């Protein structure tokens, strides 16, 4: 379990500082947390994976909700970070949040989405409404749709050497 004791300089626990860094895109605060855990990398990963705000959002959820790509990029650089945490109530992943952010800032959202996919975010995870991130788009943003659909296709198809489909893509056409 990560340390939650209060730090002397801010009065906030390490988990609270992680959440604040993610919410405010505060790379300096995140780096100071990294420095204090320099000799304890496993504890740092545990802290990053377990830190939640009062509503259940992880640091990655908050980065994607607010478009805070600098902190997200720093977090994603660490091996062992869970890139698919699901919100305890909605089951939304950071990828769901990044897609929702695309309605505000499509270019920044695309960057967030591409980075999440690059490190292994699961484009097929569904929220409590049974929706994958791509299904949140509606008719908007073809670049983001193409990125998500390409990532899902890559998951569904074995390497070309084997050349066969692992499973069919989830689509509304299946019901017809």
Language model features with spans:
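Ankyrin-repeat boundary/"N-cap" motif
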Residues: 10-18, 45-59, 85-102, 126-135
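Conserved ankyrin/ankyrin-like repeat signature
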Residues: 29, 70-71, 108-112, 143-144
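Extreme N-terminal segments of fungal proteins
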Residues: 1-49, 57, 65
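Ankyrin-repeat-protein effector appendages
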Residues: 1-20, 118-119, 128-176
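Acidic (E/D-rich), amphipathic helical modules within compact regulatory domains
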Residues: 50-79
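Ankyrin repeat domain, specifically the short helix-to-loop turn at the C-terminus of the second helix
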Residues: 3, 34-49, 73-83, 111-122, ...
């Amino acid at each position: 379990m990560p340390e939650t004791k209060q730090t002397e300089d801010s009065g906030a626990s390490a988990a609270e500082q992680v959440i604040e860094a993610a919410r405010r895109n505060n790379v300096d605060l995140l780096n100071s947390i990294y420095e204090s855990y320099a000799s304890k990398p496993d504890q740092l990963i545990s802290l990053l994976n377990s830190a939640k705000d009062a509503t259940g959002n992880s640091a990655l959820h908050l980065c994607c909700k607010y478009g805070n790509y600098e902190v997200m990029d720093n977090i994603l650089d660490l091996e062992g970070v869970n890139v698919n945490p699901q919100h305890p109530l909605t089951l939304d992943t950071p990828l769901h949040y990044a897609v929702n952010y695309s309605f505000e800032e499509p270019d920044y959202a695309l960057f967030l989405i591409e980075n999440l996919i690059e490190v292994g975010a699961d484009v097929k995870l569904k929220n409590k409404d049974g929706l994958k991130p791509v299904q949140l788009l509606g008719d908007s943003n073809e670049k983001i749709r193409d990125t998500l659909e390409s990532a899902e296709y890559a998951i569904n198809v074995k390497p070309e050497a084997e050349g066969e489909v692992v499973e069919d893509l989830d689509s509304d056409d299946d019901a017809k």
